[in-house]
A protein has these predicted regions:
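Double-stranded RNA-binding/processing signature
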Residues: 1-188
Length: 188
């Protein structure tokens, strides 16, 4: 797993790099610190943080890819990780309870909360209209961006089992905290 402790040192950076970080995205370095993951392929991070409205205003998908495809993959990665966790840790819970619990853990409201807790909204690249209409705090947009970020980590860390481990490293603490008393019985 590619984890790095992010330093607050700005030595060697120009004043523009202090705010934008090495990816050119405002807050990207802080975001990496918040999730405990440092991207090898910064283009994946950039794509994960790019809303379709920004892409449209900057030449479209071929020139400035947006996060929609990553969102698609991230949704599935998250579902598998949470499903495996519930299946392995709550062996006495019936399927219906596990399904209900997973639905609550990965619903728009929960994902928007996870996204807000890592400061994801502050890092998004939004088109002018989306920016003016409050897109940085819109739950549906935060949810989608969070799923895209998961996919970016998954792909950057090698996909497969390595990718799932990397994503689990920062997703599961939030999920476990939210899990609270949703399921009866104790986890194994």
């Amino acid at each position: 797993m590619k984890k790095k402790t992010v330093s607050n040192s700005n030595a060697g950076r120009t004043s523009g790099e202090n705010a934008r970080g090495s990816s050119g995205i405002t807050g990207a370095d802080a975001l990496e610190g918040n999730i405990g993951y440092r991207f090898s392929d910064r283009s994946l991070l950039t794509e994960a943080l790019t809303h379709s409205s920004y892409s449209y205003e900057h030449g479209g998908q071929k020139i400035c890819p947006c996060n929609e495809r990553l969102e698609f993959l991230g949704d599935s990665v998250l579902s598998v990780i949470v499903s495996e966790y519930l299946f392995e840790n709550y062996p006495d819970s019936p399927e219906g309870d596990l399904t209900r619990c997973r639905s609550e853990l990965v619903c728009e409201q929960a994902l928007a909360g996870y996204a807000a807790s890592i400061g994801l909204g502050d890092c998004l690249r939004l088109g002018r209209g989306e920016e003016k209409s409050g897109g940085r705090t819109r739950p549906s947009l935060l949810c989608d961006a969070y799923e895209a970020l998961l996919a970016a980590v998954y792909l950057d860390s090698g996909a497969g089992d390595a990718g799932k481990r990397a994503v689990s490293g920062y997703v599961m603490p939030s999920v476990i905290e939210r899990l609270g008393g949703m399921l009866t019985g104790r986890p194994v």
